């Protein structure tokens, strides 16, 4: 059995186990800020990603076995400007190693229409693009930001959200639970995703987020995207330790 696990109860500056890309940074109060904040105010047209520094093997071409995994994290989205439209949201994603940050806005930094790469993602979308259903919503994304399945949720503005994402390799079901403790609300979504058909054997796992309107016409189309804690574990049958 090949296993990997890690746990960030909080984040430390100069954290060697994380790769920070574009505007992502770790604040002085140990929060992973995916998009830019200046003097406490989120900025527009910002994109950032944070990846676990080591690759994770999600399937084995020799045995055909696929890994099951579970990840838990807490996040907070603060929307100081309710008008016109806060944007855009954050995602947990799995993609091939060494991918470049994608387009911002509704592409969340994980998709580039001109040079796409395979990915699986769970989005927490706060802005309605032309391809989106009602907002905010949770979406399961496979190689596209047009989600295969969605469910709406009510955001606790500035509050803590707890997320559990589980993948069962035997059933190929990706299951997501979102909880806002202060509101007492729970949202769930699940879909079948065949990781072996979508992704290479080794991948990166992490987060990406973007604020809105690259044109700059609506500079209030923004919000914070903060990750407060993160754990991940995966097990791949029939192989040795990572």
Curated annotation (Swiss-Prot):
Belongs to the leguminous lectin family. Keywords: Glycoprotein, Lectin. It comes from the Eukaryota. This is Basic agglutinin. InterPro entries: ConA-like_dom_sf, L-lectin, Lectin_legB_Mn/Ca_BS, Legume_lectin_dom, Leguminous_Lectin. Glycans are attached at residues 45, 220. Lectin. Disulfide bonds: none annotated. The keyword Glycoprotein applies. One of its GO terms (molecular function) is carbohydrate binding. The lineage of its organism: Eukaryota, Viridiplantae, Streptophyta, Embryophyta, Tracheophyta. Pfam families: Lectin_legB. Gene3D superfamilies: 2.60.120.200.
């Amino acid at each position: 059995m090949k296993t990997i696990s890690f746990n960030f109860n909080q984040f430390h500056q100069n954290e060697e186990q994380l790769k920070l890309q574009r505007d992502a940074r770790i604040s002085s109060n140990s929060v992973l800020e995916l998009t830019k904040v200046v003097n406490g105010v989120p900025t527009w047209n910002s994109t950032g990603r944070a990846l676990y520094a080591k690759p994770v093997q999600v399937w084995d071409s020799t045995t055909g076995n696929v890994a099951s995994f579970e990840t838990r994290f807490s996040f907070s989205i603060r929307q100081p400007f309710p008008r016109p439209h806060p944007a855009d949201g954050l995602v947990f994603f799995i993609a091939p190693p060494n991918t470049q940050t994608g387009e911002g806005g509704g592409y969340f930094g994980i998709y580039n229409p001109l040079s796409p790469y395979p990915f699986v993602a769970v989005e927490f979308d706060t802005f309605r693009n032309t391809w989106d259903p009602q907002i905010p919503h949770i979406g399961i994304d496979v190689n596209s930001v047009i989600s295969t399945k969605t469910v709406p949720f009510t955001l606790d503005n500035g509050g803590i959200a707890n997320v559990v994402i589980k993948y069962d390799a035997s059933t190929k079901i990706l299951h997501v639970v979102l909880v806002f403790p202060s509101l007492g609300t729970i949202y769930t979504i699940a879909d079948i995703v065949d990781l072996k058909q979508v992704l290479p054997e080794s991948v990166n796992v992490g987060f990406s987020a973007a604020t809105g309107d690259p044109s700059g016409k609506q500079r209030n189309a923004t919000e914070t995207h903060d990750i407060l804690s993160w754990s991940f574990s995966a097990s791949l049958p029939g192989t040795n330790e990572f």
